[in-house]
Each structure stands twice: as structure tokens, then as C-alpha cells.
């Protein structure tokens, strides 16, 4: 059997287990001839075990026969950090205004979750990446 030829890749951020065939998904998939309701059904099934509503990146590969496959990534680090310390958004002036503090344990937990998506060879390298993300949001890292 011949390998399918990929003709397009679509990147979206969609709420886990709560995707709906609305404007955002329809506008992204429609021009490529992909069935929005079919994607929504498969996406919701695959993300059913995740926290409902947490935004997750998804990369959709569209093939020449209008079929598709997709990969669900881990939630963005900023969302995991905001959830861990219970804030709505990061600081607008992260170098002067601090919005909260996060423990090293919580950062390491987030680093372990994100490890598969990060370009890091070790947990300590992943920890440094996530700690940098936290600092850029105006979140202090406990010493």
C-alpha cells in the first residue's frame, strides 16, 4: 500500500474534550476539505481523560485524499504555571511586577509533563526552561 502524501499541516489550540465544530475549527479545516465534525469527534475522544477545558496544541496533518491525522501536544507551559499557582494571567511588566510565587517542586512537576515536547535532554534542563517561562510571566521561583 502506498504511503499517503501530506499536503498541509494545521496548528490549532483547542480546549481538551470540549472542541466544537464552530468558526475557529471550521475556518482552519474547511479550506483543506477536512470534515470539522469528524475531527471534533476524534479530538474529544482522544482528550477525554485530560482536564476538561485546558487548552492543548494540536497539529493536524491533511493528506491528498482529504483524510487527516493529528497529534495532541501537552498544554503550554504558561497555562500549566497559571493553573499551578491559581492566577488568571501573567504580569504585564514581569521584571518589576510579580504576580505570584511557585515552588521548585511544582516547576519540576510541570517540567516532567512538558518533557516530551521540550528540546531538553534531562529533567534539570527542562526545569530551567520552565523556570524561565515562569519568570517571564512575572512569577517568582522559590529559592
Curated annotation (Swiss-Prot):
Keyword S-adenosyl-L-methionine: no
Source domain of life: Bacteria
InterPro entries: Ribosomal_uL11, Ribosomal_uL11_bac-typ, Ribosomal_uL11_C, Ribosomal_uL11_C_sf, Ribosomal_uL11_CS, Ribosomal_uL11_N, Ribosomal_uL11_N_sf
Keyword Secreted: no
A Gene Ontology BP annotation from the UniProt entry: translation
Keyword tags: Methylation, Ribonucleoprotein, Ribosomal protein, RNA-binding, rRNA-binding
Pfam short name (any one): Ribosomal_L11_N
GO molecular function: large ribosomal subunit rRNA binding; structural constituent of ribosome
Gene3D superfamilies per the UniProt record, alphabetical: Ribosomal protein L11, C-terminal domain, Ribosomal protein L11/L12, N-terminal domain
Post-translational events: One or more lysine residues are methylated.
One Gene Ontology term, aspect cellular component: cytosolic large ribosomal subunit
Signal sequence extent: none
Function: Forms part of the ribosomal stalk which helps the ribosome interact with GTP-bound translation factors.
Subunit structure: Part of the ribosomal stalk of the 50S ribosomal subunit. Interacts with L10 and the large rRNA to form the base of the stalk. L10 forms an elongated spine to which L12 dimers bind in a sequential fashion forming a multimeric L10(L12)X complex.
Family per similarity comment: Belongs to the universal ribosomal protein uL11 family.
Name listed for the protein in its UniProt record: Large ribosomal subunit protein uL11
Organism: Borreliella burgdorferi (strain ATCC 35210 / DSM 4680 / CIP 102532 / B31)
